[in-house]
């Protein structure tokens, strides 16, 4: 049996507990890898996070921007197979690969999309499982066939070869679930995922990167730095990413744009579109979207295509003040 067919949807409501150990194939994710003598200095001059100070056993979020500070890619950066991996939504990589390689001809660096697979491990027993397949400690660990990276409490992403994936999937007793549950946890943790549809639209602070360790304001120059610094020191950022929740009578899928409106007095005005969404078995749904940062937390939202469905803003799991 093909290992990819072992992952099944797990219908549940917000009030139901999830299995203690779940494994999924995050098929919508991949990674860009970077090797070569100049990999560190080259990447340091391209991205918002500090590459030079990144330890082998830790990861960091980061963004790659254009010269105007608009984001091409949001990624999780970590050491992988003697180089770096920038793990991110697969749909963003086609454009991002071209942009991140733009000046590589002048450096000793090889940049490509990996053929490795992203496997997600989550649940109360996730850390214990990772301990069982690794011999080291830390938030980034070398494992058979690749690397295990902690992305939040009790949640790990494994970037591993096809062969290693088959062995992991067949040997693990974890509940094999669809990647929708991985995205559910991404939403709960308010982790920004930038797909192809959202590229080149937002500055990093509109996606909360300053609050989750994705921007270094003390490193040297990088592409788009002026805009990012101006947003911080002159207060020019007017947007933020929030968790939103409501109901839908239709199936919600990011394959179709999901737009929301916000109430303005007795009228409604376009608010934006969902960056990520997860739908429960009882038609409740939760998602992430970029909104104006001057909205009251109790402002009402609604689905543009289903105006009778009212949505609300939920609290973030972190402060939006810079770390």
From Swiss-Prot:
Gene3D superfamilies named in the record: 2.40.30.160, 3.30.70.1630, Aminomethyltransferase beta-barrel domains
Keyword tRNA processing: yes
SUPFAM superfamilies: Aminomethyltransferase beta-barrel domain, Folate-binding domain
Any one GO BP annotation for this protein: iron-sulfur cluster assembly
GO CC terms, sorted: cytoplasm
Cited Pfam families: YgfZ_barrel
GO molecular function, one term: folic acid binding
Residues that hold folate according to the record: 29, 182
Keyword tRNA processing: yes
Transmembrane spans: none
InterPro entries for this protein: GcvT/YgfZ_C, tRNA-modifying_YgfZ, YgfZ/GcvT, YgfZ/GcvT_CS, YgfZ_barrel
Domain of life: Bacteria
Subcellular location: Cytoplasm
UniProt keywords, alphabetically: Cytoplasm, Folate-binding, tRNA processing
Annotated family: Belongs to the tRNA-modifying YgfZ family.
HAMAP family recorded: tRNA_modifying_YgfZ (MF_01175)
PANTHER family for the chain: TRANSFERASE CAF17, MITOCHONDRIAL-RELATED
Main function: Folate-binding protein involved in regulating the level of ATP-DnaA and in the modification of some tRNAs. It is probably a key factor in regulatory networks that act via tRNA modification, such as initiation of chromosomal replication.
Protein name: tRNA-modifying protein YgfZ
Organism listed in the record: Vibrio atlanticus (strain LGP32) (Vibrio splendidus (strain Mel32))
